């Protein structure tokens, strides 16, 4: 597993505004969308391409296009939905799947409650969207399901990560073809499982349900 923290002044600027508790939901959604597009630029650096012959108004030439099978973008419901537009803006021809995950309050493990994606992901590049990598449990469970379906190249795009979550990912997904792209690895998790300094509950702030 590999983690890539995107170092760019626009990423830092937008992330700072997202962190600010005074930022309202409409602004939060817009900035999250913009930030995802910046992260997606880095996340797709190794997207698979193939050569194609074309003809410009001047002369024939050779260019590149995205290879088949198409990349698959999978937001984790619900907060991952708020990242979808920012990702497919760069990959408009990508296929979109959905994965619903919820924590079992008895086992404290993430469980799947809804899926909408191909059964066979062999040879597919998959981009998973989830705003926060906190404890890592949800993202590990989601990526394992994708790998079980045959995905051989998975990139997780997250706005923020906690070192505890990164450690869990590195331990549980050691040796797997997984990359995490994020705007920041923050200091720690607090006793309530929130990333510090973080930005609060991304889903609540996106959808206007934060107190």
Curated annotation (Swiss-Prot):
| UniProt-listed CDD domains | PRTases_typeI (cd06223)
List the PANTHER family hit by this protein, alphabetically. Answer: ADENINE PHOSPHORIBOSYLTRANSFERASE, URACIL PHOSPHORIBOSYLTRANSFERASE, CHLOROPLASTIC
* EC numbers on record: 2.4.2.9
Per UniProt, the enzyme's principal EC class comes to transferase
InterPro entries in UniProt: PRibTrfase_dom (IPR000836), PRTase-like (IPR029057), Upp_B (IPR034332), UPRTase/APRTase (IPR050054), Ura_phspho_trans (IPR005765)
Q: Name one Pfam family in it.
A: UPRTase
Cofactors needed by this protein, per the record, are: Mg(2+)
What activates or inhibits this protein?
A: Allosterically activated by GTP.
One GO biological process term: uracil salvage
State the SUPFAM superfamilies in the record: PRTase-like (SSF53271)
According to the UniProt record, which cysteines are disulfide-bonded?
Answer: none
Q: Which family does it belong to?
A: Belongs to the UPRTase family.
Indicate which residues the UniProt annotation says bind uracil.
Answer: 195, 200-202
Q: In which pathway does it act?
A: Pyrimidine metabolism; UMP biosynthesis via salvage pathway; UMP from uracil: step 1/1
Which is an annotated GO molecular function term of this record?
Answer: magnesium ion binding
- What superkingdom does the record give? Bacteria
Reaction catalyzed: UMP + diphosphate = 5-phospho-alpha-D-ribose 1-diphosphate + uracil
Query: What does the UniProt keyword field contain?
Result: Allosteric enzyme, Glycosyltransferase, GTP-binding, Magnesium, Nucleotide-binding, Transferase
Binding residues for 5-phospho-alpha-D-ribose 1-diphosphate: 78, 103, 130-138, 201
Tell me the function of this protein.
Answer: Catalyzes the conversion of uracil and 5-phospho-alpha-D-ribose 1-diphosphate (PRPP) to UMP and diphosphate.
Please give the NCBIfam families that the UniProt record associates with this protein: PRK00129.1, upp
Q: How is the cofactor bound?
A: Binds 1 Mg(2+) ion per subunit. The magnesium is bound as Mg-PRPP.
* Protein's name in the database: Uracil phosphoribosyltransferase
- Organism listed in the record: Streptomyces griseus subsp. griseus (strain JCM 4626 / CBS 651.72 / NBRC 13350 / KCC S-0626 / ISP 5235)
């Amino acid at each position: 597993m590999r983690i890539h923290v995107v170092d760019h002044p626009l990423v830092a600027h937008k992330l700072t505004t997202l962190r600010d508790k005074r930022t309202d939901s409409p602004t939060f959604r817009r900035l999250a969308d913009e930030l995802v597009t910046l992260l997606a630029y880095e996340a797709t650096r190794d997207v698979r391409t193939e050569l194609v012959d074309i003809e410009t108004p001047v002369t024939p030439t050779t260019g590149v296009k995205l290879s088949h099978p198409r990349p698959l973008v999978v937001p984790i419901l619900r907060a991952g939905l708020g990242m979808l537009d920012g990702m497919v803006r760069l990959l408009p021809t990508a296929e979109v799947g959905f994965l619903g995950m919820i924590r079992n309050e008895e086992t404290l493990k993430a469980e799947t409650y809804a899926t909408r994606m191909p059964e066979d992901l062999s040879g597919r590049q998959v981009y998973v969207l989830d705003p926060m990598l906190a404890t890592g449990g949800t993202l590990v469970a989601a990526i394992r399901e994708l790998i079980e379906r045959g995905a051989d190249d998975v990139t997780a795009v997250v706005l923020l990560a906690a070192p505890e979550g990164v450690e869990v990912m590195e331990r549980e997904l050691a040796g797997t073809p997984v990359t995490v792209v994020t705007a920041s690895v923050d200091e720690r998790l607090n006793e309530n499982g929130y990333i510090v300094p973080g930005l609060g509950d991304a889903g609540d702030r996106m959808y206007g349900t934060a107190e």
